[in-house]
Amino acid sequence: KGFYLSDSESQAYDFAVFKSIQLGGTPIVHSFKFDESMLSSGTLNYLCFQKYSREWANFVLANRRNTQKENIHAHDIVYGPIANDKVGVQIRNFMEGNIDFDTFLKKLAFMKSITFQYFFGTQRAIDLLEKI
């Protein structure tokens, strides 16, 4: 329910390949830039997660459980670790009741090579992106 950007070109390419295998077509990676000073200017509602944490997990789980079209938060931009396939397995294990929340957090603590992403959740935020 927004526009996602990775800060890792290799992760973006790997994801494009994955989606092209799933859906057909050719993997394409588009590059964008934006003025990161906007994140601290007070102009945007910005939320930042620097690492996997209880707060990050609660935020991701709440969004995964959301069945409505509208976002459950009012943030223009959210930055934080990507819930990739390995993390997704743990999220699924927790949501299906196979592990408790503390075990879920412990498993996240052992994740290596965290990749981060930006979520642009409002038109105001998306309008700040410039394709390069």
Model-derived regions: residue spans:
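Conserved NAD+-utilizing ADP-ribose enzyme module
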Residues: 13-14, 18-132
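Extended catalytic/binding region for NAD+/ADP-ribose chemistry, centered on the ART fold
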Residues: 1-19
